[in-house]
Amino acid sequence: TVRVGLVQWQMRSYKTLDDLFEQVEFFVDAVSDYKSDFVLFPEYFNAPLMSKYNDKGESQAIRGLAKYTEEIRDRFINLAISYNINIITGSMPYVKEDGLLYNVGFLCRRDGTYEMYEKMHVTPDEIKSWGLSGGRLLQTFDTDCAKIGVLICYDVEFPELSRLMADQGRQILFVPFLTDTQNAYSRVRVCAQARAIENECFVVIAGSVGNLPRVHNMDIQYAQSGVFTPCDFAFPTDGKRAEATPNTEMILVSDVDLDLLNELHTYGS
């Protein structure tokens, strides 16, 4: 059995990275207290730091936010070791050596190693407002308790990506997302449930809630984070293992049994 924790993150103003990470560490501490193996943060959870660049255009502001990314990664690596938990850092903007801007995140293992994952399908708004480019890196990751994959938000709406990961033996799919409206959220949620059923895996989604004044293009958020399962006799009849309260800051902790997946692959309905 693997225990997963997710953070339904409230957007609020933070003046500094230290302020933001006081809240981050609080959640890592809280989730690790429940002996979780993983903690998942949402897409662009660090967006409040863009308020510092509020006088700039949107494409400049997001590049300002990207300046924090490497330090954020290093802080997460330290937290993963300190609290003995594998951290999936949601996502954040990152400027690669080619000078282009990508939406990426990191798996920070509790042994101190890390991996990077990339959003491959950036949304029309990410292109128009921020000038983001889509990544090309698709891979699964070995951890001390499960083989996992991460798809950032919109990417979960493309069945092929998850299918390729399933072929590599992925057992748990993590989906950090950020959606502003309920219809946008429904696209992510329904597709996440579809991926759990068609690929016979667990899918964990985490998003942000609340409002964010003084950050352009980030005004409102809507989320109901959750843990989804295949639909068969050994699983919940509706494929929902656990769900957060909609639009409320909270953590959700849930156990998933990987042995049930092996049984399903062989003897499922």
Briefly describe each language-model feature range.
Residues 1-12:
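Short beta-strand segments enriched in small/hydrophobic residues
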Residues 255-269:
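A short C-terminal boundary segment appended to hydrolase-like catalytic domains
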Residues 66-88, 157-249:
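CN hydrolase (nitrilase-like) catalytic-core segments centered on the catalytic cysteine
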Residues 3, 34-35, 84, 147, ...:
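Short loop/turn motifs at secondary-structure junctions
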Residues 89-90, 103-107, 139, 205, ...:
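Short beta-strand scaffold segments in enzyme catalytic cores
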Residues 17-21, 25-110, 180-193:
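Cys-nucleophile CN-hydrolase/nitrilase-fold catalytic domain and related Cys-dependent amidase chemistry
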